[in-house]
Amino acid sequence: MDDTIVSLKSQLLEREREVATLKKKLDQIEKGNSTLPELQEKVTSLSPLRLNTSLNNDDIMRYSRQLLLPELGVKGQIAISNISVLVVGCGGLGCPLAQYLAAAGIGRLGLLDYDVVELSNLHRQVLHTELTQGQPKALSAAQAISRMNSTVQCVPYHLQLSRENAIQLIQQYDIVADCSDNVPTRYLVNDACVLTSRPLVSASALRMEGQLTVYNYRGGPCYRCLYPIPPPPETVTNCSDGGVLGVVPGIMGCLQALEVLKIASGQECSFAQQLLMFDGEQTRFRSIRLRSRQKECVVCGEKPTITELQDYEHFCGSAATDKCRRLHLLSREQRVSVQDYKGILDHSTPHLLLDVRPKVEVDICRLSNSLHIPLASLEDKKPEHITLLKEAISDLQEHLNNQSPVQVFVVCKLGNDSQKAVQLLEKMSGAEVEAMTVKDIGGGLMAWAKKIDYCFPQY
């Protein structure tokens, strides 16, 4: 008899848990929240957030530690739950930002990214995993957030923000967080936020440094007030080119989340007219005051000339992508493909292979027959490296019995720096060094890894 009672009580407890789970799912559906976010591939109109006026017992338990803060309290938590935030970019900044906004109980999160998860993302983009490689980043992030806090409405967008869709999308959210990694998108997001009167919380991270500020908020400047003219494309470095220590975008993304939550809960914003700069090497923060909104600004000034979105790729002279840009500095005759170079190796044709990558990249991988002279050394004409080049060319000329100019092939990671090196070497040929014919290996070592040697490391 006792065993029967224990068994029945156990079954009853299990059924009660099932009923509680079903009630929770029903509540989510009634609030317009689905367990598995549906991926959006175009911008559609969203239904208004169901406004909360109080906290239930689960809310009080979940957010109890931040409810105890006098700066937030119940009023602030309710305000957070009634706010929607659009995160532009689900990468190194967007992942920690979205994670902490969801954990704090933001009402709706729009997650926008047109890219898919790659292995090289995982050291810094902490919402993605090995199992989500190949998935759209927006969907991967939304699913991770839904597992963490199912009460947050996640709307993943697998699309590229453009002049055609930005206004329609941004006007459906209360706050925008720019986590993008390219200049055209920054101008696009800024202008759309100004035209829709949305505050813009912007951050960036590169190498071991980060920056944070808030644009278009309570009379503060917009991005164009500070940067009316975009930088030359060749001066812009991104994570693919310059690298980044994973924890740095993590720090900046968390600070971004803090500013969003302060705006959402009605607290004073710290960086509406300040720029926070983080030096990860020294572990130091410093803040500098920014100039105020500019009367002559073309988008937020007294007489704006930009009243609709532009062609930002044309304006900036670069593509709206965080992928490495491809330079086209040489003629077709000055370049060879990796297949052509493989043929040169197979035929044992005498030549010099010059690797112009920085030493830190050469330490990762290299072709065994290459001579390493960094591009920077060629640009600065460092005597020790010019001497090294002269000796290598001289040795090869002796092997050829001085019958023809030495063939020099230049390689780098992607075929950009190698083109610059070819131009420098052609100017040196016959003057600072003996005559040579110089050609670039198109696509660089990453093309070699993809098309010739599948075991060669990619980075």
UniProtKB/Swiss-Prot annotation:
One of its GO terms (molecular function) is metal ion binding. Residues 347-457 form the Rhodanese domain. It is found in: Cytoplasm, Cytosol. Its cofactor is Zn(2+). CDD domains: RHOD_ThiF, ThiF_MoeB_HesA_family. Pathway: tRNA modification; 5-methoxycarbonylmethyl-2-thiouridine-tRNA biosynthesis; Cofactor biosynthesis; molybdopterin biosynthesis. It comes from the Eukaryota. The active site is at C239, C412. Zn(2+) binds at C222, C225, C297, C300. Its EC number is 2.7.7.80, 2.8.1.11. It catalyses: [molybdopterin-synthase sulfur-carrier protein]-C-terminal Gly-Gly + ATP + H(+) = [molybdopterin-synthase sulfur-carrier protein]-C-terminal Gly-Gly-AMP + diphosphate; [molybdopterin-synthase sulfur-carrier protein]-C-terminal Gly-Gly-AMP + S-sulfanyl-L-cysteinyl-[cysteine desulfurase] + AH2 = [molybdopterin-synthase sulfur-carrier protein]-C-terminal-Gly-aminoethanethioate + L-cysteinyl-[cysteine desulfurase] + A + AMP + 2 H(+). ATP binds at G92, D113, S120, N121, L122, H123, R124, K137, D181, N182. One of its GO terms (biological process) is tRNA thio-modification. It is an enzyme of class 2 (transferase). Keywords: ATP-binding, Cytoplasm, Disulfide bond, Metal-binding, Molybdenum cofactor biosynthesis, Multifunctional enzyme, Nucleotide-binding, Nucleotidyltransferase, Transferase, tRNA processing, Zinc. Binds 1 zinc ion per subunit. HAMAP family: MOCS3_Uba4. Plays a central role in 2-thiolation of mcm(5)S(2)U at tRNA wobble positions of cytosolic tRNA(Lys), tRNA(Glu) and tRNA(Gln). Also essential during biosynthesis of the molybdenum cofactor. Acts by mediating the C-terminal thiocarboxylation of sulfur carriers urm1 and mocs2a. Its N-terminus first activates urm1 and mocs2a as acyl-adenylates (-COAMP), then the persulfide sulfur on the catalytic cysteine is transferred to urm1 and mocs2a to form thiocarboxylation (-COSH) of their C-terminus. This is Adenylyltransferase and sulfurtransferase MOCS3. It comes from Danio rerio.
